[in-house]
Amino acid sequence: MGEEDYYLELCERPVQFEKANPVNCVFFDEANKQVFAVRSGGATGVVVKGPDDRNPISFRMDDKGEVKCIKFSLENKILAVQRTSKTVDFCNFIPDNSQLEYTQECKTKNANILGFCWTSSTEIVFITDQGIEFYQVLPEKRSLKLLKSHNLNVNWYMYCPESAVILLSTTVLENVLQPFHFRAGTMSKLPKFEIELPAAPKSTKPSLSERDIAMATIYGQLYVLFLRHHSRTSNSTGAEVVLYHLPREGACKKMHILKLNRTGKFALNVVDNLVVVHHQDTETSVIFDIKLRGEFDGSVTFHHPVLPARSIQPYQIPITGPAAVTSQSPVPCKLYSSSWIVFQPDIIISASQGYLWNLQVKLEPIVNLLPDKGRLMDFLLQRKECKMVILSVCSQMLSESDRASLPVIATVFDKLNHEYKKYLDAEQSYAMAVEAGQSRSSPLLKRPVRTQAVLDQSDVYTHVLSAFVEKKEMPHKFVIAVLMEYIRSLNQFQIAVQHYLHELVIKTLVQHNLFYMLHQFLQYHVLSDSKPLACLLLSLESFYPPAHQLSLDMLKRLSTANDEIVEVLLSKHQVLAALRFIRGIGGHDNISARKFLDAAKQTEDNMLFYTIFRFFEQRNQRLRGSPNFTPGEHCEEHVAFFKQIFGDQALMRPTTF
């Protein structure tokens, strides 16, 4: 399989830590994404590494027994260590605070601590087999204050740091889940919900395993993912992932079912809002996108993998350290190893090899694996780093070898402009709210974020269309049809078309002598009026004489002042067009000769300068009986320039009757 076929990869620079062994215990904290390597209970050192840490944190602590759990508070201010089932020890890592350990025992009698979670830099939750205890840590006093507690029988727990929600498994079957949400010193109990277990043989008692549950944020919403190894319907084979949506308000609801169509050992990750399901037996993974259209049965949506199953891209472990000799080749990493442990959203840890990776999605290979361009666009537009890939898809579908049909091209343009319009509307609403002074009264008002899915006209023009029209092998009718399709799409979404797109159409029509089509486009207002467009038409007069009148009509429709039209034309170096225009409206006797001579000189076209100079000499002769310029016209430097280029004899002689 070529590299172009793998759509999942492990990050290039993993976090490296000391491998797990009888002396070295490895722990992972999913809130800070840190790996702790604890040697000999901490007596011979603890090394903490995170994905962004340039410098790992190293320290020692007394060996007071086996470490069950170890985590820093957010911002690494306070260390918490659990060594017994009754207590958690704390140590401050704040400058000027005492480094002496202090201890907190769980409040509930006869309860055993299952674990703990930091919810902020000074707030911590103990989860016991009899409930949950929420504390504030007071580092300067070296003590804890109980903020709130709740009693219930707990089998196991799970924490989602992104949304600060803890899920507790209760009841004998372990399948009733009780969520709690934490925020700034408050603990809120959310409605509990039941996970539907698959039907099991009478002899075995079904129960919900912690291994089969994950929590993750997908498209900004919190979901509980349940890996159901057997479908609830007996006629369906294979496992499935059931997604329960857990809102901040209201009850949890089953929303999506991801069909795996296979059985065996699975693991889940979430990357770039995609659910990734790894299958150990086949050593492959599949991805699901819940935003793509699925099959809706009235209550849940069923989804199939977006793409065929593929392995994660083979990974070479880089050789580092003193043993790294140039002749040694990198060691291939065993993918889908039984020692792999996955954490949400996108983390894979190999404790036996001493690596922590982030899983990543590669978009380029997906382009060739998803032939349906409409579905491909729906998929790509939801991805974080999609812009350049989408532009390459657009270029590809307009290439000679992979040319798409016009209806497909239209669909792609419509999908792009749908996103573009959404962003423009959001920007406009924000601007209006700011203007109305709502930003002060509503602190929640945020400027819309421009994601990579917003491809505006300049992106499409620069990266796709301008190169496309240059292709000599393309039939010109197809080129024009594509340009018009993009303009149609912009109009359909009520997006003002930028003049450079109209210019591209006109230049292409002129290049192929399709003047009748140009005339029709202008006559029926397929091309919107604009000053730059009118100037372009004026410049085409020598190829297509009616362009002059079409241009003037357009400028009149735009209620443009005549002197403004002249200024626009001169700024575009359309000196002859400006002169023709001013003659056409009978204003040529009053115009400034100097302004026109300046513009003609700037073009560095000597023959153009000659023509303009001669025109004004003739005007002077007609109006004043002499071709010479008066001192008030300030044309001395132009007369000198004319003499320098063409000689004195080229000046007009006064004619006498």
From Swiss-Prot:
Subcellular location: Lysosome membrane; Late endosome membrane
Gene3D superfamilies hit by this protein: YVTN repeat-like/Quinoprotein amine dehydrogenase
One biological process term in Gene Ontology: autophagy
GO cellular component, one term: lysosomal membrane
Name of the protein in question: Regulator of MON1-CCZ1 complex
Quaternary structure (record): Found in a complex with RMC1, CCZ1 MON1A and MON1B.
Keyword Membrane in annotation: yes
UniProt source species: Homo sapiens (Human)
Pfam families found in the cross-reference section: RMC1_C, RMC1_N
Domain Mic1 as annotated: residue spans: 471-637
Record key words, sorted: Autophagy, Endosome, Lysosome, Membrane
General function of this protein: Component of the CCZ1-MON1 RAB7A guanine exchange factor (GEF). Acts as a positive regulator of CCZ1-MON1A/B function necessary for endosomal/autophagic flux and efficient RAB7A localization.
InterPro entries: RMC1, RMC1_C, RMC1_N, WD40/YVTN_repeat-like_dom_sf, WD40_repeat_dom_sf
Family, similarity comment: Belongs to the RMC1 family.
